[in-house]
Amino acid sequence: IIATRPGHTINNKFARQLRKEIRMHEIQAPVYNCNEEPLMDVNRIRELLPHRYPFQLVDKVIAIGANYIVGVKNVTSNEPFFQGHFPQEPVMPGVLQIEAMAQVGGLLVLNSVDEPEKYSTYFLKIDNVKFRQKVVPGDTLIFRVELMAPIRRGISTMKGYVFVGEKIVCEAEFMAQIVKNK
């Protein structure tokens, strides 16, 4: 790259854009094989999360590591939110994409404790949300959520991505708290 009239401002803009492009290429979509047995199915997820239909937004978990988790949601045309959002052109609401990502993050945090059935997670904060593409009936959402820092005093900070195929459709940073049930 040769610059004819470089200056501080333009160099900064170029460096920011270059960093953004590099980051986007570093993030790889998780590999999902629908024929493989999941690590957690919908019944196991029900044991850990208090959410029920129509608000249980995670169908299965296909990978769990020390600081990451990969979950799946199959979006169908029978989802109740499509009745009003939008009848002629159904689009999954962004807030529900975030909620689904938070539920996957909750499963990651619960996976870090003994006897996870005795704990609950609560969504505290969300930052840097970006929606990049519409989610429509027939899409399979793949969630990858990773811890940004170790869990301290029951508080976890996470970064999550939602993929449809190889494309990132949503990303966010969020915080959750894990609390022992009474």
Regions found by a protein language model. Name each.
Residues 1-4, 61, 126-165:
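Hydrophobic beta-sheet segments that form the core/acyl-binding groove
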Residues 3-46, 169-182:
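Segments adjacent to and within acyl-thioester-processing domains across lipid
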Residues 20, 71, 143-144, 158-160, ...:
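Hydrophobic residues positioned within well-ordered beta-strands of beta-sheet architectures
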Residues 30-39, 105-144, 169, 176:
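Hydrophobic beta-strand-centered segment that forms part of the acyl-chain substrate-binding groove
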Residues 42-52, 118:
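Short aromatic-glycine motifs in intrinsically disordered, low-complexity regions
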Residues 52-92:
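Catalytic strand-loop segment that frames the active site of acyl-thioester-processing enzymes
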Residues 61, 92-116:
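Active-site helix/loop of acyl-thioester processing domains in fatty-acid/polyketide metabolism
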Residues 75-77, 149-151, 164-166, 176-178:
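Beta-strand elements of well-folded, non-transmembrane domains
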